[in-house]
């Protein structure tokens, strides 16, 4: 029963061309067996297979394979699909990292400071940047007004420090920052936008209406949604605006709808105490408005459809994106992966949300000009509808 090492030395030929052909037909078959609509949205799926297969002998790279396969998938006019394949031959990094400071620059004077993003590197005590300061140099390199400003805030690798030279009233001064990633800055901009909406609703409703925005339908955002609505600041308010505009989806619609559907069914109290409601958070007893727009997609559309079917309140905004199929995926032996849009979503009267979306009860658009000038027609209508109901 002793182990004996056996040495094996062998070689085999690897043909990327043959691999690409196998991957093409295997991924096509996976879609053929699992696509949610048995009529393939009226397309002849076998015909498309044969049409795009003509190009297989001429494919010389994975990028070309990705291109023709995803083009073929595009013939289905569907969402939640995609084919991806990466190999060692593509393991070359040509990208750059953003060295973001949180400084907002003026649109007409692209090297002049117009504002500071809250809690960003430039918002730290001691930086003392002001509106009107002019950027002169980055890491000692003088800026050229004729070049793209972002050139100076990008690098092949992330740096722990960036040095800016600015001018104020004819005097130059230096400021050093620990830069942030572009993703971090996007999150801070989102936080500012949400806070501005919250303050806007508080001001217009005199603190009578709770406001919560969900940017996606994931577990973390669900937890934040519940924490916000059970906090004393929001739970004691008379109504709710749930904002699903720009929501990119996930899979927590059932939890959100269940929470919003809670009704008060009893009161209880400790001896000589105050009566308290059961359940503690009966939002279904209050007026609720759901905000959606043309960028509310995927599970946000499931949530909106359920909200409408359950009669939880009014939906205000524009039609949703029409981009909702629940999806799995399969991997190939080389590590390639393709998504499988397999579970269609339908209203109780049979409408396909992938092609129909969800229409609002009250249509209110929001133009690019509104966004530039700070107008809030959708929030204004939501506040108006709720206050009218509260004042009846």
Can you annotate each of these PLM segments?
Residues 21-25, 29, 46, 50, ...:
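Solvent-exposed, polar/charged alpha-helical surfaces in well-ordered, non-transmembrane soluble domains
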Residues 312-371:
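C-terminal structured "cap/appendage" subdomains that terminate the fold
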Residues 94-145, 343-344:
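PDZ/PDZ-like domain segments forming the peptide/carboxylate-binding groove
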Residues 79, 123, 137, 234-237, ...:
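In a subset of proteins, long, contiguous C-terminal domains/tails are tracked
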Residues 31-36, 40, 136, 140-142, ...:
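Cleft-lining beta-strand/loop regions that shape enzyme active-site pockets
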Residues 1-83, 344:
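Sequence signature of WD/YWTD-type beta-propeller architectures
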Residues 32-51, 102-117, 208-211:
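PDZ/PDZ-like groove recognition
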Residues 56-108, 171-197, 383-384, 390-392:
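Extended, small/polar residue-biased N-terminal targeting/export presequences
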């Amino acid at each position: 029963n002793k182990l004996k090492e056996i040495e094996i030395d062998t070689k085999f030929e690897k043909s990327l061309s043959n691999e690409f052909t196998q991957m093409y037909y295997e991924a096509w078959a996976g879609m053929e067996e699992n696509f949610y609509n048995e009529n393939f949205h009226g397309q002849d799926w076998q015909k498309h297979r044969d049409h795009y297969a003509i190009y297989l002998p001429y494919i010389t790279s994975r990028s070309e394979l990705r291109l023709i396969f995803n083009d073929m998938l595009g013939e289905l006019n569907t969402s939640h699909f995609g084919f991806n394949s990466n190999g060692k031959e593509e393991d070359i990094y040509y990208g750059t990292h953003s060295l973001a400071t949180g400084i907002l620059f003026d649109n007409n004077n692209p090297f002049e400071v117009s504002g500071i993003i809250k809690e960003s590197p430039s918002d730290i005590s001691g930086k003392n940047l002001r509106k009107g300061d002019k950027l002169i140099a980055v890491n000692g390199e003088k800026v050229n007004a004729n070049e793209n400003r972002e050139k100076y805030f990008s690098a092949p690798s992330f740096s722990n420090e960036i040095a800016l030279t600015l001018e104020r009233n004819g005097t130059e001064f230096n400021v050093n920052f620990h830069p942030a990633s572009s993703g971090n800055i996007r999150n801070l901009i989102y936080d500012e936008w949400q806070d501005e909406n919250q303050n806007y609703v508080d001001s217009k409703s005199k603190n009578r209406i709770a406001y919560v925005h969900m940017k996606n339908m994931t577990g973390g955002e669900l937890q934040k949604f519940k924490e916000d609505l059970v906090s004393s600041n929001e739970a004691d308010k008379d109504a709710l605006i749930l904002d699903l505009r720009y929501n990119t989806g996930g899979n927590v619609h059932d939890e959100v709808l269940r929470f919003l559907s809670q009704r008060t069914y009893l009161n209880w109290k400790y001896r000589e105490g105050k009566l308290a409601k059961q359940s503690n958070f009966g939002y279904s007893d209050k007026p609720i408005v759901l905000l959606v727009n043309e960028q509310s997609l995927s599970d946000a559309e499931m949530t909106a459809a359920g909200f409408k079917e359950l009669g939880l309140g009014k939906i205000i905004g524009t039609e949703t994106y029409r981009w909702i199929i629940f999806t799995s995926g399969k991997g190939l032996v080389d590590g390639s992966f393709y998504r499988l849009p397999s579970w269609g979503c339908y209203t109780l009267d049979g409408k396909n949300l992938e092609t129909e979306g969800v229409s609002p009860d009250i249509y209110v658009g929001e133009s690019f000009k509104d966004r530039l000038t700070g107008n809030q027609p959708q929030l204004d209508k939501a506040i108006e509808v709720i206050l009218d109901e509260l004042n009846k």
